[in-house]
Swiss-Prot record:
Gene3D superfamilies: Ribonuclease P, Pop5 subunit. Part of ribonuclease P, a protein complex that generates mature tRNA molecules by cleaving their 5'-ends. Belongs to the eukaryotic/archaeal RNase P protein component 2 family. It is an enzyme of class 3 (hydrolase). Pfam families: RNase_P_Rpp14 (PF01900). It catalyses: Endonucleolytic cleavage of RNA, removing 5'-extranucleotides from tRNA precursor. It comes from Haloarcula marismortui (strain ATCC 43049 / DSM 3752 / JCM 8966 / VKM B-1809) (Halobacterium marismortui). Keywords: Cytoplasm, Endonuclease, Hydrolase, Nuclease, tRNA processing. One of its GO terms (biological process) is tRNA 5'-leader removal. One of its GO terms (cellular component) is cytoplasm. InterPro entries: Pop5/Rpp14/Rnp2-like, Rnp2-like_sf. This is Ribonuclease P protein component 2.
Amino acid sequence: MKHLPKHLRPRWRYLAVGIETWPNASFGRRAFQREVWYAAQNLLGDTGSAETDMTVLQFHDYDGTAEAIVRTRRGQTNPARAALTCLDSVDDDDVRVRVRGISGTVRACEEKYIRGPPEFTEQRHVVFENADRSATVRPPRYDVETASDGAFVGATALDFR
């Protein structure tokens, strides 16, 4: 089978995506890809979702954060960004998704927007709501575990002074 000439090949754009979640959440590329497809289909419909053709090329999961590169067709970056902002959970874990930037090549996307592993995280015991609680520290954030249900409360260093 012959290759298509360069001017007939589909052109792509690559979205660098930063994902933030609670420290105990864990999900992989497959779960994130599934949620991206559902978000695109719910927002854009079947034909709009097919036109954007969003695919997760790379996914790196760290403790409470993740980074991904999502491929979409050229000219469909705005609908793709809108679909990504509709994501609020992956595998029943709450997430915050932020598009860091858009590039024309995967390499440029990695070099400009993918930062690699975040700073170190550590476990501390802090006093929160007049009780000794366990907290995961990711400067400048503190994720304090609540005693009742094991959920987390987001805080900053200013909340402990």
